[in-house]
Amino acid sequence: DVYTRQTLDKALDVYAKIAKEVNASVADIIVLAGNVAIEKASGVEVPFLAGRGDATEEQTDAESFRVLEPLADGFRNYQKTEYSVSPEEMLVDKSQLLGLTAHEMTVLVGGMRSLGITKDNLGNFSEENNKLDNDFFKKLLDMNVAWRPSGNNAYEGIDKVSGEVIRTASRVDLVFGSNSQLRSLAEVYASDDANDKFVNDFI
């Protein structure tokens, strides 16, 4: 559910072809592709260290991986279904499993949103998604916008002057404005002179 099978198969076919041409592992090519995408979006060099290996089909128990499928991934605004635990709590739980600090979690979510990596376009506040910048935080903390629920884990941002819906977000997105600790981090990145810091922290 996190990725559509069609999209995933298409991408993996391309990665496998490149890996064969340059005698590298598919795992290395996937990481390198991510690095190149971030470099193009930020204009900053991203370090790369090769050496990952690929497991063969014989070495992999495909059935055992089903229990590893994510129930929720707040970094991508994905949630498989409704749970008794809130989406933002599940984001914090995943962050702790990854060993991320609140600061690292904040900058990672902001970067993913600025690049348009989100389900159902929630939290995608940027007009162009090919640039890594602090636009998510600037627009999230815009005092001219009022938020109202529009569905399960979905909110509409209403322009206080025109009354028009100008953006949409999830509970995960809005927690960076409502939680005091996360808001303090978001305010740092939302500053006009904080874009370079944001990009460097993300990388």
Task: For the regions a language model picked out, list residue spans one by one.
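Long, well-ordered alpha/beta core segments of mature domains
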Residues: 1-203
